[in-house]
């Protein structure tokens, strides 16, 4: 489903970059939009155990790899069952004990596994309510699952449950003598539907933006006669803390229109999408030249600006 307000994303990014203000001498501004779909035709299942002592165990097939699924799931389950998230244990990934999950990828876990956990939590509450006076005589186990609605018109038998839509704006300058690009300000806006864990979500988007900076300005594989020539961390140029603009802002559009819990959508992977085209447009505004090949390295910029 194509949802959200894409125009509002662009307006928000342009407003916070100061698009209508005069551009300082020697600088250029760029604004770009990006969108990606979530992988279609996948399924997630979850199981929740409510123990007699009031603690909760949630079993999920999701793998935690820094995206914050562990914290988000504990927060959601605690909210649905009325318990402190600190009393929610999340058991992940061990296929000997957790229900089926198609994969951990494509920013899908919050929507797919989140909905499966919500169904499992509702199952727990139904069972608890059916007992006399709500008394619990033993552990209660609830199960739930979620799958994107099938659509036979699509070649893979399904459709994406949501899109990641983002807008990025930058302000930069170019050193005429070296071709070095300095980004003075960067604003990134994501349509999150509804943010579940704000601090973790901001960190995820910031990380995606930094990956986008590497894609745009420095990262490429160099091959020589003996194969890959820059295959080490010493030679492959990823962004460092010194490369990140000090004035970097990640913001969220929250319309509550996503298919996940509380109207949420998956985020973070989209952070990469619009950085390079925004920088390309800012380079054009700054130099009057179109750069159509990434990364925009100092050498490439110097050669083009000097007619080489």
PLM features per residue range, with description:
Residues 58-65, 255-275:
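Extended, non-catalytic structural segments that build the interaction scaffolds
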Residues 84-85, 291:
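Alpha-helix N-cap/start motif
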Residues 89-92, 240-264:
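Generic long, charged, amphipathic alpha-helical segments
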Residues 267-292:
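C-terminal substrate/ligand-recognition segments
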């Amino acid at each position: 489903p194509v949802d959200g307000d894409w125009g509002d994303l662009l307006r928000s990014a342009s407003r916070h970059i100061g698009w209508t203000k005069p551009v300082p001498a020697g600088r250029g501004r760029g604004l770009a939009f990006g969108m990606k779909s979530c992988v279609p035709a996948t399924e997630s299942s979850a199981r929740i155990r409510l123990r007699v002592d009031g603690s909760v165990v949630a079993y999920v097939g999701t793998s935690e790899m820094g995206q914050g699924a562990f914290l988000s799931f504990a927060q959601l389950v605690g909210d649905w069952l009325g318990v402190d998230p600190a009393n929610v244990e999340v058991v992940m990934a061990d296929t000997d004990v957790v229900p089926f999950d198609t994969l951990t990828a494509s920013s899908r876990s919050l929507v797919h596994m989140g909905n499966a956990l919500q169904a499992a939590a509702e199952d727990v509450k139904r069972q608890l309510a059916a007992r006399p006076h709500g008394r619990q005589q033993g552990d209660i186990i609830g199960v739930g699952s979620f799958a994107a609605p099938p659509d036979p018109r699509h070649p893979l038998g399904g459709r994406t449950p949501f899109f990641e839509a983002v807008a990025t704006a930058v302000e930069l300058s170019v050193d005429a003598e070296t071709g070095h690009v300095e980004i003075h300000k960067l604003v990134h806006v994501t349509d999150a539907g509804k943010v579940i864990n704000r601090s973790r979500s901001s960190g995820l988007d910031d990380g995606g933006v930094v990956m986008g900076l590497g894609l745009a300005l420095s990262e490429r594989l160099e091959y020589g006669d003996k194969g890959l020539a820059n295959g080490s961390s010493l030679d492959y140029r990823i962004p460092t803390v010194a490369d990140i603009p000090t004035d970097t802002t990640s913001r969220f559009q929250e319309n509550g229109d996503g298919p996940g819990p509380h109207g949420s959508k998956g985020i973070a992977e989209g952070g990469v999408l619009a950085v390079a085209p925004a920088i390309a447009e800012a380079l054009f505004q700054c130099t009057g030249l179109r750069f159509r090949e990434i990364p925009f390295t100092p050498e490439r910029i110097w050669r083009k600006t000097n007619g080489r």
